[in-house]
From Swiss-Prot:
Biological process annotations from GO: translation
Protein name in the entry: Large ribosomal subunit protein eL43
Pfam families in alphabetical order: Ribosomal_L37ae (PF01780)
Keyword Ribosomal protein applies: yes
Cellular component, GO, one term: ribonucleoprotein complex
Similarity-based family: Belongs to the eukaryotic ribosomal protein eL43 family.
InterPro entries in the cross-refs: Ribosomal_eL37/eL43, Ribosomal_eL43, Ribosomal_protein_eL43, Ribosomal_zn-bd
Classification via SUPFAM superfamilies: Zn-binding ribosomal proteins
One MF term in the entry's GO annotations: structural constituent of ribosome
Length: 103
């Protein structure tokens, strides 16, 4: 038997309502919202969305605050990399100051 939801996928529940372009946008959000993500604590791919912005890992029982539809949002990734870069820079400056103090 042929697959009946080749294009519509998860948005088949909306039928012909709301227009094709809006259903495509909703499809993108719903796929990311229902997907499983990797846990930053235990490393297993078992993090699922519990509520808006709340994500739970089944094996390690951790609850993570994240984005509404995705576990990590692009602004959160940017902020995290900036903080890591500043932390590394601060450690390098502290090490250089300690080395200068020694000499």
């Amino acid at each position: 038997m042929a697959k009946r939801t080749q294009k519509v996928g998860i948005t088949r529940k909306y039928g012909t309502r709301y227009g094709a372009s809006l259903r495509k946008v909703v499809k993108k959000f719903e796929i990311t919202q229902h997907a499983k993500y990797g846990c930053p604590f235990c490393g297993k791919v078992a993090v699922k969305r519990a509520a808006v912005g709340i994500w739970k890992c089944k094996p390690c029982k951790k609850i993570i605050a994240g984005g509404a539809w995705e576990l990590t949002t692009p602004p959160a990734v940017t902020a995290k990399t900036t903080m890591n870069r500043l932390k590394k820079l601060q450690e390098e400056q502290a090490a250089a100051a300690a080395l200068e103090k020694k000499n």
